[in-house]
From Swiss-Prot:
Signal peptide: none
One protein family per Pfam: Cyclase
Required cofactor(s): Zn(2+)
Gene behind this protein: kynB
Protein species of origin: Salinibacter ruber (strain DSM 13855 / M31)
Binding site for Zn(2+) 2: D54, H161, E173
InterPro entries: KFase/CYL, KFase_sf, Kynurenine_formamidase_bac
Protein name: Kynurenine formamidase
Binding site residues for Zn(2+) 1: H48, H52, D54, E173
HAMAP family per UniProt: KynB
Amino acid sequence: MALIDISRSVSPATAVWPGDQEVQWTWTARRNEDESSVNLGSLRLSTHTGTHVDAPLHVKRQGQATDDLPLDSFVGPARVVDVNANAPSVRPEHIGQLDGASAERVLFKTSSGVSPDDEWPDAVVPIQPDTIHALADAGVSLVGTDAPSVDPLDSTDLPAHHALLDTGIVNLEGLVLTNVPPGRYELIALPLKIVGGDAAPVRAVLRDAPDP
């Protein structure tokens, strides 16, 4: 079964939140140079680089860290929802009727996703808190977006982040859904096991959902 890569590429050219740690890649050893028998690389980056999961610790001082997040939230049935290109935010009417297991994880495809990996967007399509509460009522365990944040980029009170925290929904940001049609899929998006982390990079993929 073919996999669809929905992850941002990570390189020194990858755009990051203004003021955040930029991606730094260096070779610490090169084969056949300096008597080394192997190539070794060193990578320095923000926990929020590219496609990543936010842990509750990101917005709550004593919140749950990435290594404590339940792994079953990151694997299983998912639905890609295509939000109107002109929509200023993701509202309850965009989610429609979510059915059964395919509603366990919802990924929003918005106009935010058109920015290339090396360009930070001027604005994003945020998710309204009432949308998040509607998703929680439908039994959703994970919400994903192709935006680098579920809130407006200039937000300081972070209402969507806190709504996700209050409802216990996992927050997956920075997806690449440009060429993914809306519909049912299986999501696999396991975060790095960073002890005490506020967030963690993810390699996220989709594959066609198995027949019900």
